Amino acid sequence: MNPLIFTLITSTIVLGTMIVMTSSHWLMIWMGFEMNMLAIIPMLMKQYSPRSMEAATKYFLTQATASMLLMLAIIINLVYSGQWTFTKLMNPTASIIMTVALAMKMGLAPFHFWVPEVTQGISLLSGLILLTWQKLAPLSVLYVISPIINLDLLLTMSILSILIGGWGGLNQTQLRKILAYSSIAHMGWMTSILIFNPMMTLLNLSLYILMTATTFTLFMTTSTTTTLALSHTWNKMPLITSSTLIIMLSLGGLPPLVGFLPKWMIIQELTKNNNIILATLMAITALLNLFFYMRLTYATSLTMFPTMNNMKIKWQFNHTKQTKCLPMLIVLSTMTLPLAPAMILLN
């Protein structure tokens, strides 16, 4: 892609998200979503192929439907309240429709159907943008309207997202699909605590973006898209591969890695709010997500086939293109759990 066009598209994506996050006018928020959607589609088709065309079409149809529902909710709220700005007296019907529209844009279950297919059909860089940056705009709107969201609807979608995110990733061999299902599960964790403690949602989102960005950067460094290809990188780049596996375990929420921190704090907060059954269900379903990451780690590191001795030192002569910020991302993605006591005391 031409660098000038790439810069223009990226700037439009950022601008659309910033408009959504900073506006208090419903029409401006809708326009920001539309700018973001129309700008991301050329990014999805950056590597032209039938799969990328199919992925971009699925993304467009889903986001267009969500935008239509969002506009319907805005109009209903306008008729009820008589104003275009945020109001705490939102019509219950408009609130439900808007929650469904934002869930479709985020990929929450049961509106998750497009996330794995679209992520699988695009490049790693586009997948990184789709699973991180594209979550900011709808989640920011949910954050603002959280006091008036239907609690039962949001918690139902959260539990379904955690369950489907763990269940769907069990039989996957494509790394992009695994990360897509992991994204669905993480969105479920974020929305489950949104009404009770919105600041904890922001903490979870920050750590999720950090870990996902690091994982995608490592995959781009090794040009890896399948579990088989990941296992073959062990002899060539053992340090990069071991770092990838540790960060994926962190994404699964294995203590003492940093991915355990948001799950721990969310379950603690739900318990404080007397949601014992919900916290128990989330803890049990989180094991599904951790299981397929542990299975991937086991298959990659502990089931290596016998190799010749001269292959063991191949990594010493392999000059791979390194990213300067990669070591810092790896450290932040795995070793920030000691911040937990300070966060709990501040909370």
Curated annotation (Swiss-Prot):
Its EC number is 7.1.1.2. GO terms for molecular function: NADH dehydrogenase (ubiquinone) activity. It catalyses: a ubiquinone + NADH + 5 H(+)(in) = a ubiquinol + NAD(+) + 4 H(+)(out). InterPro entries: Complex_I_Subunit_2 (IPR050175), NADH_DH_su2_C (IPR010933), NADH_UbQ_OxRdtase_chain2 (IPR003917), ND/Mrp_TM (IPR001750). The keyword Zinc does not apply. Its main location: mitochondrion. This is NADH-ubiquinone oxidoreductase chain 2. It comes from Rhynchonycteris naso (Brazilian long-nosed bat).
